[in-house]
Amino acid sequence: QWIHEIKTPITAMKLLCENHRMDWTKELLLELEKTNRFTEQALYYARSEHTEKDYSVREMALSQVVHQAIADNKYLLLQSGMRLEVEEMQDTVYSDEKWVRFILNQLIANAVKYRTEQPVLRISTHKRQDQVVLVVEDDGIGIAASDLPRIFEKGFTGQNGRMVQQSTGIGLYLCKR
């Protein structure tokens, strides 16, 4: 409940900035995006402790969730100059929509955080037997081979993560949970 009370003023500030476009509002919007992302991580961290109570599997349109996650990150994506390549998706899948959206938001934020000079983010699907696999890939700086075994550990930021001040080491941990 307390997280939602924090998110309400963040959303209100974002709307005010969007309605009053000035030079300084762009920077404020980016900072609000970061604040919102950390708040989301706190919310999902709390939820991850009791997924059996929170997880709700339903039929969902994958394209809708992908486009919602892109919209969630529009200021980050625009500021970063990230080029998006999103494949048309007709698939419906059974999953928890809010968790899929959270995971996509984390992956998009990581793609922006660890981008190269001319960043590209690709989102597509492919079928594997009776499953639909959602593929999110970028051309970022990558993950050191020595860090790969630990990237899903709680609090682990890795070699590249330690160079970026906004790394918490909680995002991929929550994605895996």
Label every model-predicted segment.
Residues D138:
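Acidic ATP/Mg2+-coordinating residue in the GHKL
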Residues A111-V112:
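Short helix-loop "hinge" at the ATP-lid/N-box region of the Bergerat-fold HATPase_c
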Residues R58, R83-T92:
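Conserved catalytic submotifs in the C-terminal HATPase_c
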Residues K74-E85:
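Short conserved segments within the C-terminal catalytic ATPase subdomain
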Residues Q118-D130:
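Short beta-strand/loop element within the Bergerat-fold HATPase_c
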Residues I143-G155:
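Short conserved segment of the HATPase_c
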Residues F156-Q166:
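Glycine-rich ATP-lid/hinge loop adjacent to the conserved G-boxes
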